[in-house]
From Swiss-Prot:
<dbReference type="GO" id="GO:0044179">
    <property type="term" value="P:hemolysis in another organism"/>
</dbReference>
<keyword id="KW-0732">Signal</keyword>
<comment type="function">
    <text>Pore-forming protein that induces lysis of T.cruzi trypomastigotes, bacteria E.coli and human red blood cells. The parasite lysis is much more important than the hemolysis, probably due to difference in membrane composition. Its action on protozoan parasites and bacteria may indicate a role in the control of microorganism growth in the salivary glands.</text>
</comment>
<keyword id="KW-0044">Antibiotic</keyword>
<protein>
    <recommendedName>
        <fullName>Trialysin</fullName>
    </recommendedName>
</protein>
<keyword id="KW-0472">Membrane</keyword>
<feature type="propeptide" description="Removed in mature form, probably by the serine protease triapsin">
    <location>
        <begin position="20"/>
        <end position="55"/>
    </location>
</feature>
<keyword id="KW-0812">Transmembrane</keyword>
<keyword id="KW-0354">Hemolysis</keyword>
<dbReference type="GO" id="GO:0042742">
    <property type="term" value="P:defense response to bacterium"/>
</dbReference>
<comment type="similarity">
    <text>Belongs to the redulysin-like family.</text>
</comment>
<keyword id="KW-0964">Secreted</keyword>
<keyword id="KW-0406">Ion transport</keyword>
<dbReference type="GO" id="GO:0044218">
    <property type="term" value="C:other organism cell membrane"/>
</dbReference>
<dbReference type="GO" id="GO:0005576">
    <property type="term" value="C:extracellular region"/>
</dbReference>
<dbReference type="GO" id="GO:0006811">
    <property type="term" value="P:monoatomic ion transport"/>
</dbReference>
<dbReference type="GO" id="GO:0016020">
    <property type="term" value="C:membrane"/>
</dbReference>
Length: 260
């Protein structure tokens, strides 16, 4: 069952539960702590200590509200893809499983980073990317230069948050789609920084990559290693990755991180 239908069933179940008054439950101390840790204290009404057990009411309205936000986020991430794209992603999954594609660590100096994707079939070829972070008063960009086997092929300026831009690259790799994704990172002192990723997919191989960095103190740092994934483009042109269930396609996001 896909995540979409599973979520619909869960929504229906919570709406059914929401139609009843707040229910009272008696939990032993261990279960009580586990439930509170998972959902949060704000979703309960304590009614005193009965000695060995604590009684409280679950607030279904708050639980449903929290669940609705989670469902909305997941549904927003789900994307429709063509049958051809789904086949390509499954092909990419098989290729990655056989270690036919690898990616090197992202190495950065000041505002510029570089990494290479190595394709080992049918013969070994390298697709290297140089990513330069550029921030202006208007917007934030990633200037991406691509080269195949040490030969320069393209340079694109990607605004963070925009839809992907695709280029037909000469050589073995073919069409490549790229997008800049923006998140946020806070330092331990609370200072706001830019947390970003470059997402790309080589449609011919059904393989994508996500390379992330943090811009802070006028230079880029790396906290998360580059990732490869089975990927394609959705019907609306976004970059998507194959979900763990092997059926759904989801958008790329930026992992929230905290820096020193």
């Amino acid at each position: 069952m896909s995540k979409f239908w599973l979520l619909l069933l869960l929504v229906a179940a919570f709406q059914f539960a929401h139609s009843y008054p707040a229910a009272e439950y008696e939990l032993d101390e261990t279960t009580n702590d586990e439930v509170r840790q998972f959902i949060g204290d704000g979703y309960f009404e304590d009614e005193g200590d009965d000695g060995d057990e604590e009684r409280f009411k679950i607030k279904p309205g708050k639980v449903l509200d929290k669940f609705g936000k989670i469902v909305g986020k997941v549904l927003k991430q789900l994307k429709k893809v063509s049958a051809v794209a789904k086949v390509a992603m499954k092909k990419g999954a098989a290729l990655l499983k056989k270690m036919g594609v690898k990616i090197s660590p992202l190495k950065c100096e000041e505002k510029t980073c570089k990494s290479c994707v190595i394709f080992k079939i049918p013969t070994e070829n390298s697709f290297c990317l140089t990513i330069r972070f550029m921030k202006t008063n208007i917007a934030t960009y990633l200037v991406v230069a691509g080269e195949i086997n040490r030969k320069s092929k393209f340079e694109e300026k990607l605004k963070l948050g925009n839809m992907p831009r695709c280029v037909n690259v000469e050589g073995f790799i073919g069409k490549v789609c790229m997008k800049g994704i923006e998140g946020h990172a806070k330092s331990s002192s609370g200072q706001a920084n830019v947390n970003f990723c470059l997402g790309l997919v080589a449609e011919k191989f059904g393989v994508g990559a996500k390379l992330c960095g943090i811009y802070a103190n006028k230079k880029v740092r790396v906290k998360i290693s580059p990732q490869l994934f089975p990927g394609a483009t959705s019907l609306d042109g976004d970059i998507v990755k194959l979900d763990d269930n092997g059926e759904d396609a989801t958008t790329l996001d930026v992992d929230e991180v905290e820096i020193d």
